Amino acid sequence: MGSISRYLLKKAADGLKDEQRLKIEMSDSKSVPECFHFNRERRMPIAEINGEDGFFMFPSQQSLENFENTKKYSNELSPDAIGIPLFQIINCTLPFGKRGHSNTVVGNVPYYKIFKFILRTADEPPPYTVAKIVCSNNGLILYKVPLYDIYKNVSQANVTYSFVGTTSTEPNLLAMAHREGHRDLDTKVNNLNLRWHVTYSPVVTNDHYKLILLADYEVNRLDEDVIRAAKNKMSIDQKDQKVQRFVAAHYTREFETSLFRWVAQEGHLILGEYSTDQGSFGLNNIPPLTEELGCQSLLIHYIEYMKRQRKKIAKEARRQNKRNVANTTNMNMNLM
């Protein structure tokens, strides 16, 4: 077998392992909370659109591809709502757009905002008074509405992100928290203790987060003090038990596409859901849990993006300093 054939076989095998590693378990076991009794897997791409601020999340790969193959927002709207993004997240602290260098919050200004796209018929009233019309045709209207303001609070031990609903119908129950200097993000959804866990690698930066279900005795950074104290008092024997981690979702950047395209895939949320409409790939019939985890993964994506930007800026500064030192040295030598 030639080297090219071996290489192709290895790539195919690696791809199969990646697919298996990112699979979502379909289970109706009593040991798994009922909200995680899934009957299908959904893949929601996160994309950067040329000329637009922030990042967009699409309800399915099919929806993104439909959007990419048509002109932005000018395609014919259809009742299946395929080809329309579900969410957009923007950074409120960057004065020069998404690629600005600042990340300083002023007063009570939110760090991030999440918008939701909603499709209605022309006969239906707007979903909210703050709804902005994006486009309309075929008796349908596409609205863009503010969904969450995300505030960042830095305490002595934790960094907490609070999702504040911008309409009266959105509950203010979403929050994520991590230890200062660490990447794992704790959250609570449906009163369950969950953690977006990323495995540390000293060699390369790992961008694969798993949403895992915590055991009853494991401390969540969003726990109240009395609950945290009770968990810490649990027996060591119980804590030493090996826990079978149930994974409800994955966030990954493994399938990103070229940045030189006008729509560049930069990440994916892969999650399980229970759906009564197995053929829905657009905005229709998306479960609330899917939307909540979608908003959380968008925040993770932007946090990781800002870290890469800061590293890039620091690297460029070091290069510029080296060039300045070299130029100064050359000038001094020429003067001698």
UniProtKB/Swiss-Prot annotation:
The keyword Cytoplasm applies. One of its GO terms (cellular component) is cytoplasm. One of its GO terms (biological process) is invasive growth in response to glucose limitation. Keywords: Cytoplasm. It is found in: Cytoplasm. The keyword Flavoprotein does not apply. Present with 736 molecules/cell in log phase SD medium. Involved in regulation of invasive growth. This is Protein DIA1. It comes from Saccharomyces cerevisiae (strain ATCC 204508 / S288c) (Baker's yeast).
